[in-house]
């Protein structure tokens, strides 16, 4: 199957005449199709939830589209946590995966109901102290 761009050269030239560059142009239909495909692929696993890495594309409009398909937000900074909360993520919708993280970021992630994902066993004792 031959892949074709979601926008023609003529349409792209029309867009660039109207909007200054640089800008990002997203394929909403393609994003929705892929999010739906992931959701359907794992539908057999009732506990499965996909978490989108916010740092990959910190665009609240795209993240809201992904939320429509059951995706949560994988955050790695205070800014990403705050954005995810601001766009309506609820408890359990946020995964916080962060390295070399200030105490206040762990506290905030916990406060908003984030799932704290650790990659270092020594953080367990640290979190136990600060999240009491």
Predicted regions and their residues:
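A charged N-terminal "starter" segment
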Residues: 1-116, 122-131
């Amino acid at each position: 199957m031959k892949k074709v761009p979601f926008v023609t050269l003529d349409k792209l030239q029309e867009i660039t005449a109207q909007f200054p560059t640089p800008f990002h142009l997203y394929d909403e239909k393609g994003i929705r199709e892929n999010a739906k495909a992931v959701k359907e692929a794992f539908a057999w696993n009732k506990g499965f939830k996909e978490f989108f890495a916010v740092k990959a594309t910190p665009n609240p409009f795209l993240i809201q589209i992904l939320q429509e398909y059951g995706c949560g937000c994988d955050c790695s900074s205070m800014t990403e946590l705050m954005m995810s909360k601001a766009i309506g993520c609820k408890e359990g919708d946020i995964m916080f995966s962060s390295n070399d993280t200030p105490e206040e970021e762990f506290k905030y992630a916990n406060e908003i109901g984030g799932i704290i994902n650790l990659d270092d066993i020594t953080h367990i004792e640290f979190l136990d102290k600060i999240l009491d």
